[in-house]
Amino acid sequence: MRKQSTTILTLPDFSKTPSIDQVGVEERVARFQTRSIKKESKVQGLKLALNMIDLTTLEGKDTEGKVKQLCYKAAHLHDVMQGIPTVAAVCVYPTFVKLAKRCLEGTNIKVASVATAFPSGQSTRKVKISDTHFAVDNGADEVDMVISRGEFLEGNYSYVFDEIAAVKQACGTARLKVILETGELSTLDNVRRASEIAIYAGADFIKTSTGKISPAATQPVTLVMLETIRDYYYKTGKMVGMKPAGGISTAKIALQYLVMLRETLGDKWLSNEWYRFGASSLANDILMQLQKEQDGVYQSGDYFSKD
């Protein structure tokens, strides 16, 4: 059931958003990529990354059968290997939320739903709010919305802020992840500004991408977003989550993202309450790497289910 929020949101002066030193960002990312992870820490990191995944299917050809299969996989990873955690959530279109909730009943796996005319965001606010209400009323624990990139790029920051705040209110008790679609924002300065708008408007998480355009998540963009979260935390004491999504398909890259997370935000963010990976194939590679660490042998990719 939806509950009305009484939070009063105020709009800071986003013209004072600091400029980003792109060279400095790239240098910091390069340092994270050189970190060596020893075996015991690697296994711990792989399990943590697995527990942070939003296992996702967001295709026009999605069917009830595919969603059921995805939910089964999410709930039965331990059938493949003992002692591993579940994923954090399954992410689907609003029309499949009720089905996913039914399939995952009795587990601690959340159901996330995209909304607000995903992935383009090209619709009226009324339609976006209705889309959000539909997802929440059908049981979505989390909502992944998209910002209006056209309005943002035209400098209509108040419009973007107000829309996010309205969707946040429509979410009630469901957590809100705000997708910036960083591949369409062109500059790191824009990524920083969009991150600030989303955070101040009430985002529980900020998220890089829909996964529908290229580039999707990149490490420089993710670092800028993490640093925005850090600066907001220093100023307010409030934690905001982060979700890189799209293009993260290997365990090696996921571990690099976790190193970046820990060294930028600290251990408090090292849980799926505050960090997620949006992915469809990452889980399989993590399972393969865990099997290798356990048995010393790589399984064929076909050993693990694809969906």
PLM feature spans:
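A short, histidine- and acid-enriched strand-loop-helix "catalytic/donor-clamping" loop
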Residues: 58
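N-terminal beta-loop-helix "entrance" segment that forms/cooperates
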Residues: 285
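Charged, compositionally biased N-terminal leader segments and the immediate start
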Residues: 1-50
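Alpha/beta enzyme core
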Residues: 40-48, 61-85, 95-243, 249-280, ...
